[in-house]
């Protein structure tokens, strides 16, 4: 038993299904000095498995007319797909695959780290309001994981590695 709980809420108004997979892991579960790792791993779960190439997960969802995305918070990370209801089995298989079989190498991880750094620049570093919120949160939660930004501190994101990402994935996902 891996603790997976399934909740099904029927809605017959449209022939679509929305699948959300919520992992009980987020930024608050990161080790000191590894801020941003939970969010980084969220990005990396779209980068391929033993049976899917990098980016193929989202391409397959789009090919069947669906959409997908993910988000990270302090206490959880969630992945979702919305597709025609007859494609539910397809997306469940894809999620099960990346839940167990993520494959990472520096060729995939290092460019994605740059993507996360750019995301931080655009959302936080280039926004005085976002910088203020980040500093207020840091002051409110001294010596607590909630004081670190979910996206991570720039200097710590720069030091995230393939090994750290795989260790986090194995501990919290696989």
Located regions from the model:
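Active/ligand-binding-proximal structured segments within catalytic/core domains
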Residues: 3, 12-61
């Amino acid at each position: 038993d891996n603790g997976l709980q399934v909740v099904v809420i029927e809605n017959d108004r449209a022939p679509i299904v929305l699948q959300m997979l919520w992992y009980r892991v987020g930024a608050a579960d990161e080790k000191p000095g590894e801020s941003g790792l939970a969010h980084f791993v969220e990005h990396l779960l779209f980068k391929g498995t033993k049976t899917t190439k990098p980016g193929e997960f989202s391409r397959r969802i789009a090919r069947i007319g669906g959409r997908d995305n993910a988000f990270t918070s302090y206490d959880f990370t969630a992945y979702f797909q919305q597709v025609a209801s007859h494609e539910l089995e397809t997306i469940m298989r894809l999620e099960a695959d990346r839940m167990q079989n993520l494959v990472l190498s520096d060729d995939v991880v290092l460019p994605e780290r740059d993507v996360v750094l750019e995301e931080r620049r655009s959302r936080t570093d280039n926004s005085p309001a976002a910088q203020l919120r980040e500093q207020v949160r840091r002051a409110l939660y001294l010596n607590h994981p909630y004081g670190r930004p979910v996206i991570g501190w720039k200097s710590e994101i720069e030091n995230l590695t393939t090994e750290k990402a795989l260790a986090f994935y194995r501990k919290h996902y696989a």
